[in-house]
């Protein structure tokens, strides 16, 4: 379900409690969450999509949150399917939008979504580049090998919020972690297990962030 994170920022991701193994390797008895956000300003930026398994829920969350407005940007932090699964749908649904990704991420769009036409629709960003949405300004920081080579994170300088891709993730769905009811529940165990299995061997790169 959508949830307000900050004055102009809404969470529009989805929990997936039907999945038993993350990346077909790691048991996730509490499932996982696919995290996606919308920043509302003079221009609207959608931060990542979700896995196709949750397409219907994400589309509903997105369009309910937009209230008839059209997004200007889709910021793609990471090209794994749990972040990028609905890029092609988004590009077709919002033909005037621009897809923002790292220099290494842009070529992967056509590799992952060969039937989609991204020509004239992309913006490649590099370390320290910024994107103004109006009041909000995003700064992009490259995070290669956290844990794929094209990964980047973005920092909303106005809100003081970091959109961190996989760098600081955790296993488990958000409902069971108290995200929707503001309860403080244990994040540490599943956060540590996620870091050890997914990002641990790239610890130096994570710490550089």
PLM region spans:
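Metallo-beta-lactamase
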Residues: 4-7, 101-209
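Active-site environment of divalent metal-dependent phosphoester hydrolases
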Residues: 19, 79-84, 107-109, 147-148, ...
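Short, flexible loop segments at the rims of nucleotide/cofactor-binding pockets, characterized by
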Residues: 22-27, 50-52, 76-78, 138-144, ...
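Conserved phosphate-coordination/catalytic loops
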Residues: 30, 52-56, 81, 200-207
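Active-site metal-binding motif and surrounding structural segment of the metallo-beta-lactamase
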Residues: 42, 53-100
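Glycine-rich, histidine-containing beta strand-loop boundary motifs that form or position
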Residues: 78, 101-105, 165-166
């Amino acid at each position: 379900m959508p949830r307000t994170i900050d004055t102009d920022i809404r969470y529009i991701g989805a929990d997936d409690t039907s999945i038993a193994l993350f990346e077909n390797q790691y048991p996730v008895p509490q499932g996982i969450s696919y995290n996606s956000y919308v920043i509302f300003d003079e221009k609207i930026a959608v931060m990542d999509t979700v896995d196709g398994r949750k397409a219907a829920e994400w589309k509903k969350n997105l369009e309910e949150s937009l209230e008839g407005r059209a997004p200007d940007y889709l910021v793609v932090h990471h090209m794994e399917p749990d972040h990028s699964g609905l890029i092609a749908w988004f590009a077709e649904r919002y033909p005037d939008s621009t897809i923002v990704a790292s220099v290494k991420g842009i070529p992967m769009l056509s590799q992952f979504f060969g039937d989609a036409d991204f020509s004239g629709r992309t913006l490649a960003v590099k370390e320290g580049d910024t994107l103004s949405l109006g009041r909000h300004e995003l700064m992009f920081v490259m995070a290669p090998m956290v844990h794929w080579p094209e990964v980047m994170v973005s920092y909303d300088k106005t809100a003081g919020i970091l959109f961190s891709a996989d760098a600081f993730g955790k296993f488990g769905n958000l409902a069971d972690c108290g995200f929707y009811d503001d309860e403080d529940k244990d994040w540490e165990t599943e956060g540590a297990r996620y870091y050890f299995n997914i990002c641990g061997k790239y610890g130096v790169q994570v710490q550089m962030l």
